[in-house]
């Protein structure tokens, strides 16, 4: 019994030693030392996931803004990072060449160290993700929907002709549409659709056929800008 208890205590002690401390990360933390910029990142996203990725060496602006960004953030804790970057960019442009020169020298030194440590390094920018194409179909044009609703055909329209009057009105409309006289069909269809919606749904099929068989407006070919090539 004592042997079992001792083995359990030993396992618990080993597991407790293997548990990392809270807040401790697996990579080297950032410091104010410029050489810390050369560390490798692990666990990156994208194509570098699971592989070590080498960071680019800092340029002169990054060397200068490293301390300036911390100073501005302490003075303005409510300012967003994008606004801080804009302010630092404006301040950097206002510096003279003599004031910028020490930071250019430091950047050249860091680049030389980077080349010595990573001689085969090549900068490979990450590709921007392409927007995914939507599979949703675009809504149909109102004119095509209108034509499907207004066309009076025994195959499409839900009612049948009960008397000779409604059938004659239907044949009359077909003769007018197929005649050689040019007609502004689009405007006529819009007028008929508006009139159809204004009527009650309780109207009989004969009444609807009478409304649809109204004479369409006549427009001469010169007004429409059409030639005889479109009409026989």
From Swiss-Prot:
Which SUPFAM superfamilies did the record assign?
HMG-box
What's the short name of a Pfam family annotated to this entry?
HMG_box
Which residues does the annotated region (Disordered) include?
24-53
GO terms for MF? calmodulin binding; DNA-binding transcription activator activity, RNA polymerase II-specific; RNA polymerase II cis-regulatory region sequence-specific DNA binding
- Residues in the DNA-binding region are 54-122
Oligomeric state and partners? Answer: Interacts with CALM, EP300, HDAC3, KPNB1, ZNF208 isoform KRAB-O, PARP1, SLC9A3R2 and WT1. The interaction with EP300 modulates its DNA-binding activity. The interaction with KPNB1 is sensitive to dissociation by Ran in the GTP-bound form. Interaction with PARP1 impaired its DNA-binding activity.
Q: Could you tell me what this protein does?
A: Transcriptional regulator that controls a genetic switch in male development. It is necessary and sufficient for initiating male sex determination by directing the development of supporting cell precursors (pre-Sertoli cells) as Sertoli rather than granulosa cells. Involved in different aspects of gene regulation including promoter activation or repression. Binds to the DNA consensus sequence 5'-[AT]AACAA[AT]-3'. SRY HMG box recognizes DNA by partial intercalation in the minor groove and promotes DNA bending. Also involved in pre-mRNA splicing.
The entry's protein name is: Sex-determining region Y protein
What organism is recorded for this protein?
Pusa hispida
């Amino acid at each position: 019994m004592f042997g079992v208890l001792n083995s359990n205590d030993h396992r618990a002690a080993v597991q407790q030693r293997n548990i990392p401390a809270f807040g401790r990360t697996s990579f080297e933390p950032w410091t104010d030392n410029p050489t810390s910029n050369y560390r490798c990142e692990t666990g990156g996203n994208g194509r570098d996931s699971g592989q070590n990725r080498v960071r680019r060496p800092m340029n002169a602006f990054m060397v200068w803004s490293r301390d300036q960004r911390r100073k501005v953030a302490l003075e303005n804790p409510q300012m967003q990072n994008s606004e801080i970057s804009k302010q630092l960019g404006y301040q950097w442009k206002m510096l003279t060449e003599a004031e910028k020169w020490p930071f250019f020298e430091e950047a050249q030194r860091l680049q030389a160290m980077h080349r010595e440590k990573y001689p085969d390094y090549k900068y490979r920018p990450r590709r921007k993700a392409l927007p995914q194409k939507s599979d949703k179909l675009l809504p149909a044009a109102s004119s095509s929907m209108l034509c499907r609703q207004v066309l009076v055909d025994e195959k499409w329209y839900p009612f049948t002709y009960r008397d000779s009057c409604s059938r004659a009105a239907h044949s009359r409309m077909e003769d007018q549409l197929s005649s050689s006289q040019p007609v502004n069909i689009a405007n006529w269809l819009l007028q008929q659709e508006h009139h159809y919606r204004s009527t009650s749904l309780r109207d009989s099929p004969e009444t609807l056929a009478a409304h649809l068989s109204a004479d369409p407006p006549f427009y001469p070919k010169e007004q429409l800008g059409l030639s005889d090539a479109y009409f026989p």
